[in-house]
């Protein structure tokens, strides 16, 4: 039984009902419908912290999905899971791949910046200020891109950019 039919969360149930209605109304191929079902089940598993199950669903959705825009969100969610698991290199790879397909994903730029900032803090703890500055500079570039896409969001990042004199 698909995960979306067994989930007890009200929001997930509502999303599933609306998604099922849309899938019936909007003309889509059976492959697109199946890809969306895997994507939806991946979201459900991810929201419950079942990352292995979510990844299986996302990989299957990627195999079936042909639309680059839709694939970008699948890739983004795979990146989120790798971020949550502390697999930052893999996460960055998936965020990059998502942005290749959809350059309007400010949340991907933000997450990439957070990872770079974290690596900068790690470098400081290890006593390597030169490497830390390089990571912080990279974080700044990603945050600038996120802010450019959605002005008014990422206020903490905006403040950090001003405080560290990285905002142009």
Swiss-Prot record:
GO biological process: photosynthesis
Keywords: Chloroplast, Membrane, Photosynthesis, Plastid, Repeat, Thylakoid, TPR repeat
Membrane topology annotation: Peripheral membrane protein
Mapped TPR repeat ranges: 35-68, 72-105, 120-153
A GO term from the CC aspect: chloroplast thylakoid membrane
Domain of life: Eukaryota
SUPFAM superfamilies reported for this sequence: TPR-like (SSF48452)
Any Pfam family the entry gives: TPR_1
The protein, known as: Photosystem I assembly protein Ycf3
Native species: Jasminum nudiflorum
């Amino acid at each position: 039984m698909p995960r979306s039919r067994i989930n007890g969360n009200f929001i997930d149930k509502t999303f599933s009902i609306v998604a099922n209605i849309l899938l019936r109304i909007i003309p889509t191929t059976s492959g697109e419908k199946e890809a969306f079902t895997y994507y939806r089940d991946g979201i459900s598993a991810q929201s419950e912290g079942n990352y292995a199950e979510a990844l299986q669903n996302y990989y299957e959705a990627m195999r079936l999905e042909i639309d680059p825009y839709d694939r970008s969100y699948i890739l983004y969610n795979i990146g989120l899971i790798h971020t949550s698991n502390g697999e930052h290199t893999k996460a960055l790879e998936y965020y990059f791949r998502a942005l290749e397909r959809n350059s309007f994903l400010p949340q991907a730029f933000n997450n990439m910046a957070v990872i770079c900032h974290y690596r900068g803090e790690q470098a400081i703890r290890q006593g390597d200020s030169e490497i830390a500055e390089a990571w912080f500079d990279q974080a700044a570039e990603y945050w600038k891109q996120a802010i450019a896409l959605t002005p008014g969001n990422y206020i903490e990042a905006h403040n950090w950019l001003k405080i560290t004199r990285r905002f142009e």
